[in-house]
Swiss-Prot record:
This is Photosystem II reaction center protein Z. The chain crosses the membrane at residues 8-28, 41-61. One of its GO terms (cellular component) is photosystem II reaction center. May control the interaction of photosystem II (PSII) cores with the light-harvesting antenna, regulates electron flow through the 2 photosystem reaction centers. PSII is a light-driven water plastoquinone oxidoreductase, using light energy to abstract electrons from H(2)O, generating a proton gradient subsequently used for ATP formation. Belongs to the PsbZ family. One of its GO terms (biological process) is photosynthesis.
Length: 62
């Protein structure tokens, strides 16, 4: 269970780092938002899901 929690936290940190870099790049590019809207929404949905997963796993471990 601890390994699953650690992997979920690592995935959350990695996803946060990727979104931190990619979202401003998408907004700054001339045609970026209209062509990459689905990718940004998918990444945001993944991030929200990982936040809830980490919270659930944390309550099971503690």
């Amino acid at each position: 269970m601890t390994l699953a929690f650690q992997l979920a936290v690592f995935a959350l940190i990695a996803t946060s780092s990727i979104l931190l870099i990619s979202v401003p790049v998408v907004f700054a590019s001339p045609d970026g938002w209209s062509s990459n809207k689905n990718v940004v929404f998918s990444g945001t949905s993944l991030w929200i899901g990982l936040v809830f997963l980490v919270g659930i796993l944390n309550s099971l471990i503690s």
